[in-house]
Amino acid sequence: MDEAEVRRGTQSANSRWGNTVAILSGDFLFARSSKLLADLGPEAVRVQAETFERLVIGQLRESVGPQGDEDPIVHHLEVLADKTGSLIAAAGRYGAMMSGVSAEVTDRIADFGESIGIAFQLSDDLLDIESEVSGKTPGTDLREGIRTLPVLFALADPDTSPRLRELLSRAITDDAEHAEALAALRIHPAMDQAREVLEQWADRARERLGALPNCDAKTAMATLVDSVAYRAV
């Protein structure tokens, strides 16, 4: 939907085959997943329907932006929860459901998935500004005028310079201005604020694992939290 040419370091479907094929491919995947889930019972179908609903709501909210007196930072985090957290939560819930664990454990694993999904997107927000080796060109979101968490914190800071505030209020297509904005953001307190929020979501994911019995799966999930949280360090 954002016409991005690269997704996770790989050429995007819409860039390679065009929007029509990309959209229809997504529709096909949803249809095929519904067909597979139909054999697993009504609860499995319900989880998918609720997840798809959240995904669409998240995309709609991102497209229209925060409304009225809605806090842009809260809005951003809720969009990440709906667009990414919901998907990882559903994956965790399915695994727990099919393994036959208790409802309490299932909820914990789903909440772990949601938390790590949000943490992943927040690390992406940071990497867009500070990394040269993240699989995406630094400042891609800045060029497109997308307000990531560091940008939102910078705009909310009364001490942010008028020049940086002006740059962050629009898409930055000029190379010199783009480099200027990146350099200013990299030393701005907004980066530390965004890292702190990332750590909070990573800590929440770790907390959800705490009550689970020790096993290889738990160890792997704990390692996953660290790899997500610290890829932006």
Report each predicted region and the residues it spans.
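All-alpha prenyltransferase/terpene-synthase fold signal
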Residues: 1-233
